[in-house]
């Protein structure tokens, strides 16, 4: 039971951070528009690129997990998230921004897919564990604006 709680806690924490990260995408757009001098349509395209990446995770993740395993997949796909945020902070040319937002979405979607699978596989068919997983995402998304306003 203790090892299951440890496993679930890491999934819950990852979903909390994932929820907070998703709201950051919208929060940074006004600054990105100003600093990079991009139009609202390009900024909207970046949001679409993020959503497309999230969708692409459904196609990238299963074969990758089958080839290298879940653990290596979650580590490599999770590593995309801070790496893409770092690239975005450098305010590269727009095509690079689009690619970074797609890869950011793939990383976010992969975290979601694998955490859902791990919790589902280890919850003995009880929905409470998955409900709690998605609640932690919502709490992270809710608290994100408050946490970012501290800085």
Where are these regions (language model features)?
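Small-residue (Gly/Pro/Ala) motifs that create kinks and tight helix-helix packing interfaces
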Residues: 29, 61, 140-151
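Residue-level signature of mid-helix packing/kink "hotspots" within the transmembrane helices
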Residues: 23, 50-59, 141-142
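Hydrophobic core of transmembrane alpha-helices in multi-pass small-molecule transporters
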Residues: 84, 95-110
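Glycine-rich segments within core transmembrane alpha-helices of 12-TM secondary carriers
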Residues: 126-146
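Intracellular juxtamembrane helix-capping segments at the cytosolic ends
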Residues: 109-123
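Conserved MFS/SLC helix-loop-helix module at the cytosolic interface between two early adjacent transmembrane helices
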Residues: 56-95
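Extracytoplasmic
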Residues: 6-32, 38, 112, 116
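Juxtamembrane helix-start elements in MFS-like secondary transporters
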Residues: 29, 38-47, 130
């Amino acid at each position: 039971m203790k090892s299951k709680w440890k496993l679930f806690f890491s999934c819950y924490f990852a979903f909390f951070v994932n929820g907070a990260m998703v709201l950051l995408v919208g929060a940074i757009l006004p600054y990105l528009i100003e600093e990079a001098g991009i139009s609202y349509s390009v900024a909207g395209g970046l949001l679409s690129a993020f959503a497309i990446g999230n969708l692409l995770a459904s196609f990238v993740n299963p074969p990758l997990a089958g080839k290298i395993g879940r653990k290596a997949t979650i580590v490599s796909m999770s590593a995309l998230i801070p790496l893409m945020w770092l690239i975005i902070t450098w305010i590269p040319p727009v095509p690079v921004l689009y690619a970074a937002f797609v890869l950011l979405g793939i990383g976010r979607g992969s975290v979601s897919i694998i955490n859902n699978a791990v919790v589902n596989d280890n919850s003995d068919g009880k929905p409470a564990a998955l409900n709690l997983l998605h609640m932690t995402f919502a709490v992270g998304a809710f608290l994100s604006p408050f946490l970012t306003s501290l800085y």
